[in-house]
């Protein structure tokens, strides 16, 4: 039986929904550049984005999926832990997911950036190349012909992309649910038989790892960066 929603969970749901519709239909600049989480080397990066990105979502399906998970699993976790510990879990998981993603992106960016430095370009020239490429939506492959195109695309994605979503926080709630109630049977609309929480949530995360590797993450923080194509040198 579904637990009734507390004021805490209602507030989280309402804030997420209101900010999504506000940023989508009324204040388009609310998400970018203010509230979405940018790469740490990007001038748009601000410390508050580590919190605010958790209340932004890139599309309606992402919002619905996260809010449905919050609605289904959060009430029983809050009842078990208490409101204070539940909020600590929720935001700590969100912060940890953001820190991990920022760290991975920073390492990946610096690795490719250093490869560009070895070609003889200066840091200033590389950043100018990045900014011009982002503005154009494409880049000149002849700037550093020995660097693989995919590496340049990844560098541009890391620098020019933003991260949004409550998925990291939701993941923390799901892990807590699997740890506290591993054998609780779950009845799901798309599965015609009960499945234990530990198996369902375990499969859920495995699918997300696969999705992250293929670029179609289910629950990971959504990255809203654009794709970039290469131009010939004489363009």
Regions found by a protein language model. Give the residues of each.
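A short, hydrophobic C-terminal helix/tail in secreted or cell-surface proteins
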Residues: 231-235
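A detector for small-residue-rich transmembrane helices and their helix-helix packing motifs
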Residues: 1-230
